[in-house]
Structures are given as structure tokens and as C-alpha cells.
């Protein structure tokens, strides 16, 4: 089993101020996702994780010790993620270059400051509280929100909300469908351990509680319409 938390690593669980709006960058597949009903600084740009944005993603991961000592956001994939950060980095890069890893990257200026990982269930099959999840499952989602991460120095500034909103817009561009997330209540779990995100962040963006699968963990769902 992986030495990484099999459930990703969301940092910015709550925000002290509203999330910033997102702007479009046509050349880099940047999205202007779910419109938020407020304006605040800073303004973030969201780009899809792919070969063109890999370097910025890798810089953020390296700046934050490989994420949990070298996970490289591999914990949700079905690969044999290990304690060796070199192995995990190479495995993640292969997935990105092969189009088998999806994420919305949040930029402030030229710097990537956070992300939200998502994918179809066969791309991100690992989730926490699996036994309880399977016991209550009646259907499978089209997409899962695996995890989000916000770099040090950028937390509690709306990055997590921008990342999740960006992921939803990318999902719309990929055909939309039913999206599941597995957040916990920010009032019950320290921000550094909210690997799947804060329940309030999801609900802010239209997710509905489906069922509880852990002491503080919920399955939440939302239908995303196909993008034009």
C-alpha cells in the first residue's frame, strides 16, 4: 500500500475572505468556471494540468516537500505509489504526459499556488472510508474529486474554492456528468488534515450531501452540465 495518504491532501479548508474570480487564458486551456457572486483580490487563473503546465505543478510540489514527504499526489491512483519521491514524481509525470491524470491548477500571476485533482473512478479508484462507501453505494459517479492542495503562504485566501470551481468547469468541458466529492467538516478536522476538502467549500459550489461514510466524512454530489 502507498505510504502517501490514500486520500489526497487539501490544505485550504476554509477561507477568511471570498474566493477570487477566475479569468480565461485561451492559449493554455484556462477556464472561467462557476461564476462566483463576489469579487476579491487576488485574481486567480486556472489552467488544466498537462504537459504545458507540468513544470509549474512540479515546482509547487517540490516547494512543499513533495507533498507529505514525497507523495506527489499519487495516493488516489491505482499505481504502486511509494515512499520514494523520485518514483512518485516519475509516475505522476508519466500519467500527465499520457493524459491519465487530471487537475485544475490555480495560478497567481505566473506561479501555481494550488490544485484540485479529479478523474473518472478508474483513474482515481482509491478513496477513504471505502467499506462504508461501498456499503451505501447504489450508482457510480462519472467523476470524482480526489483531492486539492494549497501551497504554504496561500492558504485561507480562496485558492481551494477556485481550484474546485476550476475542476468543475474542466469536467464540463469533458462532457459533464455526476460528480462526487468526499469532504469533511472544517469545524471537526484541522485544516492540514482535510485531504478531501471542507464540506462548506463543496456546498458553496452547489454540491448536495448524499450520505455520511465516516465520523466527519460525507459523500456529496453535483451534476455538471456539458460545456458549450
Predicted region positions:
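Conserved acetyl-CoA-binding loop-helix of GNAT-fold acetyltransferases
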Residues: 147-150, 156-172
